[in-house]
Amino acid sequence: MPPKQQPKADLAKKQKQVEDKTFGLKNKNKSKNVQKYVQSLKQSVQPKPDATKAAAKKKKEEEKAREQELNELFKVAISQPKVPVGVDPKSILCEFFKAGQCQKGFKCKFSHDLNIQRKGEKIDIYSDTRDEDGDMDEWDQETLEKVVESKKNEYNQNKPTDIVCKYFLDAVEKKQYGWFWSCPNGGKECHYRHALPPGYVLKSQMKALLEEESSKKLAVEDEIENERAKLQTATQMTPALFMEWKRKKIAERDAGLAASQAERAKNDRMSGRELFLSNASLFVDDAEACEEYEREREQEETEQKAKNKEAEAGTSKSSGDAEQSSKEVNEEEEDDDDDDDDLDMDELDELEASLSKTSIQIREPNDEGSS
């Protein structure tokens, strides 16, 4: 560790002692011995210099001198680029600053920003940079023949196309496309186009346009008011007019439905619902329909049998015929009982009436025989 420096108060005190000791000495500025004595006193007061610090300082000065010498040698090889007409020099990076040799600082007319190249002209996404490689304006005949020969097989294997590369579109949409972008599909060897077709609108741009249009679009209330303002003056709407209009619309609707149903009925294309609405009496439940059919059939059979019995009873006057008819009636009744044990009240009444008639017919021959 370097020695600690003495406080300023101690230094001032020692200097005062040196002045006191040298005060009044004769020939202070002439005698060499006196000057040596004074010098020894001053050295005793001043702190001793650190040898390591002095050596480090000397080494640093030597390195700085050597570096400056090298810079002077390499400075000859560095040259500033030529500035085209109409171009701002601040848009061009200083070559001396790039090599760490520019001594002008902020006064330099060139830019000292290492990112100035990235901030320069943006790449054109509507043109393919590979199209410039095929410029043959400066080719001679020999070069042209070599290129044709080398490209003959390559062209057949990798024919150019107008299809836009999907990786290029993805990079443009994600804002990753730039001078340093490389296509994952082979870089410059990709045979798809790396340029947008004329008039192509990106999805992000389309979204911004839609948002702008939606912001300019009027609200629904404003549109309604504008449309109402465009309407011409007409009859004022009243409840009576509204009810009349409603009745008219209902009548028109009913007429249209009736016409359509009539047309469908004419073509036998009516649905079950339409048939039910037109005539509901045609439809009954399945169980009730079966019972009603059986009841009607039994009534018809009973009436027909009663008529037949009356006709037979009027023509025959013998008791044998009456007994035979009564047996037939009994057999028919048994058959009816077998067919259907449960008879309605109407059927029972009719059966009782027919039996009473047959009993009367049976009694009449007996009365005649007794007389």
From Swiss-Prot:
A zinc finger (C3H1-type) spans 88-115, 159-197. Signal peptide: none annotated. Residues 330-352 have a biased composition (Acidic residues). This is Zinc finger CCCH domain-containing protein 21. SMART domains: ZnF_C3H1. Keywords: Coiled coil, DNA-binding, Metal-binding, Repeat, Zinc, Zinc-finger. It comes from the Eukaryota. Gene3D superfamilies: 6.20.400.10, Zinc finger, CCCH-type. Residues 1-64, 290-371 are annotated as: Disordered. Residues 10-23, 292-312 have a biased composition (Basic and acidic residues).
